[in-house]
Every structure is written in structure tokens, then in C-alpha cells.
Regions:
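A residue-level structural signature of the nucleotidyltransferase/glycosyltransferase Rossmann-like core
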Residues: 26, 32, 51, 70-71
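Nucleotide phosphate-binding site architecture
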Residues: 40-41, 51, 79
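Acidic/His-rich active-site region of diverse nucleotide-sugar glycosyltransferases
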Residues: 1-44, 57
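A generic structural signal for short
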Residues: 24-25, 47-49, 91
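Active-site-adjacent helix/loop segment of glycosyltransferases
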Residues: 64-139
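Helix N-cap/coil-helix junction residues
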Residues: 45-46, 68
Length: 140
């Protein structure tokens, strides 16, 4: 996770055959993650310092550190009301909490030099995301 790029597999894409096959993925989102309880305990469970956002990425990174693999299972069925508890998908509150969590995640899983070098880019990307979120709210 050296550059801080976090993305769901197939997010905001139309369903297609490429998502119909079991495949490896970099992380599992918290709303649909499933793992053995002994593995969950071995990696230290969820890090409570991530109250919302990136806790699942952190968990997935630690899971992979012990040599485990993460798979996307297309036959699973999950219904998740995205961002409902935080004011909606494009809320400013969500953006703030998400940005703080991303910086915390990168700080936890990257070395200091990478964090220092990447910080200006991360701030720029965060501001672009804020502008896009504002536009999405405007055009809803």
C-alpha cells in the first residue's frame, strides 16, 4: 500500500461477465468480509483507532501480511445501504472522515519517507475528490 490507492473491485461499473468469476482482490470491504475467526483473532481483529473507513483495508493488509489471500466471490449476495449512517454517499462529513482515515492508513502501512513524499499528492487527490463530491451533490 505504498501510494495509498484504495478502490473496490468493479465499483461504479455496470455488471458484466468479468465480475462473474472467483478472483483474488487486494482487500475485502467491511460490509461483506468473511474469514475464519481464528485468522481474525491472529491478525488482531479490527483496529479500533479506525472508527469508520479504511478499517477493512487495514484488516486486509494485515491478513495478507500473514500470507493469506483475499478473494472476490461473485455468487455471494449482500445488500448494503452505502453511507446511510454518515449522511449519504457524497456528504462532506463522509469526505472528512474518509480522508483522515486514509492518511492514518498510509501512515500505518508505509514508511516515513514515502509518507513525506506522497503527502502533497494525497492532499491534491483529496481536494479533487472533495470537488467531485460537491459536483455530484449539486447535480443530484
Amino acid at each position: 500500500m505504498p501510494i495509498g490507492y484504495i478502490r473496490h473491485k468493479g465499483i461504479r461499473k455496470n455488471d458484466s461477465p468479468i465480475y462473474s468469476h472467483l478472483s483474488k482482490t487486494d482487500y475485502a470491504t467491511g460490509c461483506c468480509i468473511c474469514m475464519r475467526s481464528n485468522d481474525f483473532i491472529e491478525i488482531g481483529m479490527f483496529d479500533d483507532s479506525f472508527p469508520m473507513y479504511c478499517e477493512d483495508v487495514d484488516l486486509s493488509l494485515r491478513f495478507k501480511e500473514i500470507g493469506k489471500k483475499i478473494f472476490y466471490v461473485p455468487d455471494s449476495k449482500v445488500w448494503h445501504k452505502v453511507s446511510y449512517s454518515i449522511g449519504g454517499e457524497f456528504s462532506i462529513n463522509k469526505w472528512k472522515i474518509k480522508q483522515l482515515a486514509k492518511f492514518k492508513l498510509i501512515n500505518k502501512h508505509s514508511n516515513s519517507l514515502i509518507m513525506i513524499l506522497m503527502f502533497p499528492l494525497l492532499v491534491l487527490l483529496s481536494l479533487i475528490e472533495l470537488m467531485l463530491n460537491s459536483l455530484m451533490r449539486w447535480f443530484r
